[in-house]
Amino acid sequence: MIKWPWKANHTAALAPLPWEAALAIPLLAGLSDEQQQKLVRLSERFLQQKRLVPLQGFELDELKSARIALLFCLPVLELGLEWLDGFHEVLIYPAPFVVDDEWEDDIGLVHNQRVVQSGQSWQQGPIILNWLDIQDSFDASGFNLIIHEVAHKLDMRNGDRASGIPLIALREVAGWEHDLHAAMENIQDEIDLVGESAASIDAYAATDPAECFAVLSEYFFSAPELFAPRFPSLWQRFCHFYGQDPLLRLRLRETPALSDGGQVH
């Protein structure tokens, strides 16, 4: 039985939230009791430091707030909450939102167009999300909007823009870059063969290194059984960077407990 220390020792600055209910999603099912408690402590601090801002009539309740915080803190469970410095607000739309996008083509002409976005993040600025896609981030499908945007934030700690190479030791950069680009090429080869819609990894990962890191971070936490065997070298680099092994958690969860001479209970 899990002992929930926040039930008796919550801070006055933050009312107790329904953490047990918030933890009851497939994405977090493999966490040990100790990991769950650590994640909740980080999430409490996250909600004390960041402001969740509902937009366009979206109603934010305690359970939604708790689950959003848990997903933000899962990638930094071992890195530490300071890795999420650099922003103070999370803006939440009820559904994907329209933004004005400006881009420059190959000959230098600047174009403007309105595009639909699921989420956005900048180095210094808020993270923007939408609730419809957040809800789809609770399972173990390989899609996770919050982890995707958090990965961009972690990536940008290494410079002014996301590059696909997070803040790692200099001696590891060349190997990381090699393995990441190899993964991009592999994903693109599959897209060329079967098409974007049939690809086993989100085709967005093949667009550039920053998106590859963000997309594969989604798979790292929510579909490790797809990531690890396909890109074993890059998987080990992700495990080392995040300080976690979601595939091991998945295997432990799926392995029946044996005791009393091998009898399954």
UniProtKB/Swiss-Prot annotation:
Subcellular location: Cytoplasm
Keyword Cell wall biogenesis/degradation: no
Any one annotated GO CC term: cytosol
Keyword Protease belongs to the record: yes
Location (main, coarse): cytoplasm
MF annotations from Gene Ontology: aminopeptidase activity; metallopeptidase activity; zinc ion binding
NCBIfam families listed in its UniProt record: PRK15410.1
Functional note: Involved in the modulation of the activity of the glucose-phosphotransferase system (glucose-PTS). Interacts with the transcriptional repressor Mlc, preventing its interaction with DNA and leading to the modulation of expression of genes regulated by Mlc, including ptsG, which encodes the PTS system glucose-specific EIICB component. Shows zinc-dependent metallopeptidase activity.
Subunit comment: Interacts with Mlc.
Name of the protein this chain belongs to: Mlc titration factor A
Gene name of the encoded protein: mtfA
